[in-house]
Swiss-Prot record:
Taxonomic superkingdom: Bacteria
Biological process annotations from GO: cysteine biosynthetic process; cysteine biosynthetic process from serine
The enzyme's E.C. designation: 2.8.5.1, 2.5.1.65
Recorded catalytic activity of this chain's protein: O-phospho-L-serine + thiosulfate = S-sulfo-L-cysteine + phosphate; O-phospho-L-serine + hydrogen sulfide + H(+) = L-cysteine + phosphate
Subunit and partners: Homodimer.
Pathway the protein takes part in: Amino-acid biosynthesis; L-cysteine biosynthesis
Keyword vocabulary terms for this entry: Amino-acid biosynthesis, Cysteine biosynthesis, Pyridoxal phosphate, Transferase
Cofactor entry: pyridoxal 5'-phosphate
Annotated residues for binding of pyridoxal 5'-phosphate: 201-205, 288
The protein, known as: S-sulfocysteine synthase
This protein's GO CC annotations: cytoplasm; cytosol; peptidoglycan-based cell wall
Role description: Catalyzes the synthesis of S-sulfocysteine, utilizing O-phosphoserine (OPS) and thiosulfate as substrates. To a lesser extent, can also use sulfide as donor substrate, producing L-cysteine. CysK2 thus provides a third metabolic route to cysteine, either directly using sulfide as donor or indirectly via S-sulfocysteine. S-sulfocysteine might also act as a signaling molecule triggering additional responses in redox defense in the pathogen upon exposure to reactive oxygen species during intracellular survival or dormancy.
Amino acid sequence: MRSRQTRDRYRLLPEGYQVTPGRNRHPGTMVGNTPVLWIPELSGTSDPDRGFWAKLEGFNPGGMKDRPALYMVECARARGDIAPGAAIVESTGGTLGLGLALAGKVYRHPVTLVTDPGLEPIIARMLTAYGAGVDMVTQPHPVGGWQQARKDRVAQLMAEYPGAWNPNQYGNPDNVGAYRSLALELVAQLGRIDVLVCSVGTGGHSAGVARVLREFNPDMRLIGVDTIGSTIFGQPASNRLMRGLGSSIYPRNVDYRAFDEVHWVAPPEAVWACRSLAATHYASGGWSVGAVALVAGWAARNLPADTTIAAVFPDGPQRYFDTIYNDAYCNEHELLGGQPPTEPDEIASPLDAVVTRWTRSTTVIDPTQVVS
């Protein structure tokens, strides 16, 4: 029963105002139950009622990867894979690192994060503030790029730290299982979902969310969003400006058979979408968010009007204040080229051409199974 003081406080609220319980004993309980927001498609060329639902994972303390960070640690502890107080060592481009720093605080494990010079200074400083060690590699691997260089450094550190545990986000099935909660939240918020649009990096959230949503709608379509220069879907590796999606290695958690089609997006196109979202909806994010919004808007224009489209926005905009939202940076990298075309280029197979701008293919291949 509420105290008199509490009842008096509630009388001050406007009639009909709903209060969501928000008391948390530790920061791990703040993860999840993120909102969805209706986003009319951004091009402005179609019916304003056309749009998609954005799952705003930036409302988590550190972003979407708080979910797998906590879940992977919880599962490892339950299995006895990591001893109480043992070190956690992992490779990260930033977002999982924030989640692991959180998990380290919740479960009292020291955390060392191996990253590269592309990590934004604001994230490096915050990781240090959260108590994590930040280990920076200085040279990319000649074949596997920065990701392989980070993985190699993790292996070195694991040999130096007896009893340390590596989550291995690229191949750990718990990374996939962690997203069941996100999928069930979407079902509770939206009901039947016809199309899911996800960025693809480690492959965890696209596989984990789609698997659960298809328990409710087996015909749901999954659209994967990658960046140009990424090897995940069979393109050759090249320098990648966009972080948070794409890869220069082949993560085992990517479920190639789950995808109905894949889109590659270039940095200027993602920047346009991010800035458009910020200007029109006060809800934006980083490279993955811009790329996903561009593709989800395309789906909203081209699919029947009653199609329910869910798009996962993995983070918020704050860490990108000096890149995506910095005119000097964008001009230096020629990212302010104006509105992209309303339709992507199309290729029959990812092996047919090297893509350099927004491109779509309905043929999805597992490049590790391609015989040259």
